[in-house]
From Swiss-Prot:
<dbReference type="Pfam" id="PF02601">
    <property type="entry name" value="Exonuc_VII_L"/>
</dbReference>
<dbReference type="Pfam" id="PF13742">
    <property type="entry name" value="tRNA_anti_2"/>
</dbReference>
<dbReference type="InterPro" id="IPR025824">
    <property type="entry name" value="OB-fold_nuc-bd_dom"/>
</dbReference>
<comment type="similarity">
    <text>Belongs to the XseA family.</text>
</comment>
<dbReference type="InterPro" id="IPR003753">
    <property type="entry name" value="Exonuc_VII_L"/>
</dbReference>
<dbReference type="GO" id="GO:0009318">
    <property type="term" value="C:exodeoxyribonuclease VII complex"/>
</dbReference>
<keyword id="KW-0963">Cytoplasm</keyword>
<comment type="subunit">
    <text>Heterooligomer composed of large and small subunits.</text>
</comment>
<dbReference type="GO" id="GO:0005737">
    <property type="term" value="C:cytoplasm"/>
</dbReference>
<dbReference type="GO" id="GO:0006308">
    <property type="term" value="P:DNA catabolic process"/>
</dbReference>
<keyword id="KW-0540">Nuclease</keyword>
<keyword id="KW-0269">Exonuclease</keyword>
<comment type="function">
    <text>Bidirectionally degrades single-stranded DNA into large acid-insoluble oligonucleotides, which are then degraded further into small acid-soluble oligonucleotides.</text>
</comment>
<keyword id="KW-0378">Hydrolase</keyword>
<dbReference type="InterPro" id="IPR020579">
    <property type="entry name" value="Exonuc_VII_lsu_C"/>
</dbReference>
<protein>
    <recommendedName>
        <fullName>Exodeoxyribonuclease 7 large subunit</fullName>
        <ecNumber>3.1.11.6</ecNumber>
    </recommendedName>
</protein>
<dbReference type="GO" id="GO:0003676">
    <property type="term" value="F:nucleic acid binding"/>
</dbReference>
Amino acid sequence: MTQDGSAPANSAEHPWPVRSVSVKVMQWIDRLGSIWVEGQITQINLRPGARTAFLVLRDPSADMSLQVTCDPELIRRSPVPLQEGSRVVVYGKLVFFPARGSISLRVLEIRPVGVGELLARIERLKALLAAEGLFDERLKRPIPFLPKVVGLITGRGGAAEHDVLTVARNRWPAVRFEVRNTAVQGPTAVPQILTALAELDRHPEVEVIVLARGGGSVEDLLPFSDEALCRAIVAATTPIVSAIGHEPDNPLSDYVADLRAATPTDAAKRVVPDAAAELALVRELRARSAAALRGWVDREARALAQLRSRPVLADPLREIDRRATEIERLRADARRCVRHLIRTESTATAHLREKLTAVGPAATLARGYAVVQRVTGPERHVVRSIADSPAGSQLRIRVADGAVSAAALGTTAAGTRIADDTGGN
């Protein structure tokens, strides 16, 4: 102890003795005071003549329990007989036993949780989950048509397991199951179901999980309305079918599951197809396909026969011959038109040639006219005026039958009397 009476700081050099730890635990428990606790009775030890009754109170949603002691009269005077599996609310104070380092709850009052209260709690939880959107249809995952492996969570050796396996194998003999047997009622049900659900959800071949139980009372079905289980179903990646088989008060697992089945038998029918029905459907579809194909072939054959009966196909050369005759006629008409056009144009051309000849230079020269050209080196220019041919110019005179070379001796203006050959300029 320190000088002020307090315990020294705890360390490896200054460890607390067990008695100090026990004292601190008792002090903390004393400060906690009396408390209300809810749980499920898993064990009752009520010996005749004993002054103390011993119970074990378990949390339905977790693998945790608490030792409870009480006056035996509290159990005997309970308005509802208390038994293993009963849900209760107790009032008492924790007691620490230093000698063995254990804690027990000394109970002064026990209140059984009735069916009405249980249903009210379920309704409150249902409203909470609905407000969070956990019942939304958009969250529902589709059930595979033919799953590789079906996971099954159910009680060991119960009717639910037998019904699911028998019905499923009768419908599809090759179906495979991964079965996890758990408690389906009582305080251990929820932890075991959660463990099995996690295992099957991780299984690489399990494509759908069936949670099955063959009905029961409200108290028996409480695990399937547990909040932890409902949230685990929503969080799972594998589609889950809830087949608890209880009407009309459905457990909450029915609302959060991807598919609700009325019974385990119904669940087997919903997750596995009926091989006989599928074969019958295949046969029906094959028959319908064959009938449709035959009908199509018949229609096409009739259409082909109609086409073959048409004249153009019955005697295809007839149309070719008719077209050939028409083409030959058109060719003869074309030749006739071309010859007529050539004759017409030839006559017109001859007339034009005659006109050109009559007005052309050669005809004019033939009538005694001449064309006078002044020769300047290699160039020749037609003389149209006396100014174009001054005296001394070299001239070329073209007549009808040739040309004459001459020289200009002089010029005489129009209207001037021409003198004799020796006069003039």
